[in-house]
A protein has these predicted regions:
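Flexible, compositionally biased loop and terminal segments
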Residues: 4-190
Length: 190
């Protein structure tokens, strides 16, 4: 049974069916495919997926979070070295309070569960994004996850939380403007 948006599960099932459960690296060799060094996924559309099935948007978010585990197994089996999941963007704060609260609840659970799974699978986990706006328990869970997995040597798994392209560009431009401003002040004061 497919729990959420089906992409990686279908790939896994097809490989198992076609090659009797051989690892994906063998599958790639047979097809002559080059494995990418880094795969990044934006978790988008889970709410719409649920709505199409006449379920609440939050159901889609829960199911989408479970699919991340399937994706981790697929990219690891393929031999991908770096996997990034964009889990919560800065733009997600604009959603309803109930939806944001649900996303934070899912995130809390995921971060705690991720420690044991990552240790078992030798995955090194890092979280990128802005800490502001995140609760202290989530920040503590992030620190715990990164600290416990820092010496793992397998797949490098990055979770982007409170991260957004527009926000990153805005902060970069502001930083450059601040540097220019400081340089002008230094030049004018001489």
């Amino acid at each position: 049974m497919i729990r959420g948006p089906p992409g990686p599960r279908i790939v896994t099932y097809c490989v198992t069916y076609w090659y009797g459960g051989e690892h994906l690296d063998t599958f790639n060799e047979k097809l002559g495919l080059r494995v990418p060094g880094h795969v990044a996924v934006i978790l988008d559309g889970n709410g719409r997926w649920a709505k199409k099935r006449l379920m609440p948007r939050t159901y889609g978010h829960y199911q989408g979070s479970k699919v991340v585990e399937d994706m981790l197994h697929v990219v690891d089996d393929m031999g991908v070295k770096y996997f990034t999941v964009y889990a919560f963007s800065t733009e997600n704060w604009n959603r309803s309070k109930d939806e944001v609260d649900t996303l934070m609840k899912i995130l809390r659970t995921y971060l705690v569960d991720c420690v044991a799974k990552s240790m078992k699978n030798n995955e090194r986990c890092r979280v990128i994004g802005r800490p502001d706006g995140l609760s202290q328990d989530i920040l503590d869970s992030i620190h715990n996850l990164e600290e416990k997995t820092k010496n793992n040597t397998g797949l490098n798994f990055t979770i982007a939380i409170n991260y957004g392209g527009r926000d990153e560009i805005r902060r970069a431009v502001k930083s450059i403007a601040d540097e220019v401003k400081l340089s002008r002040m230094t030049l004018l004061s001489r």
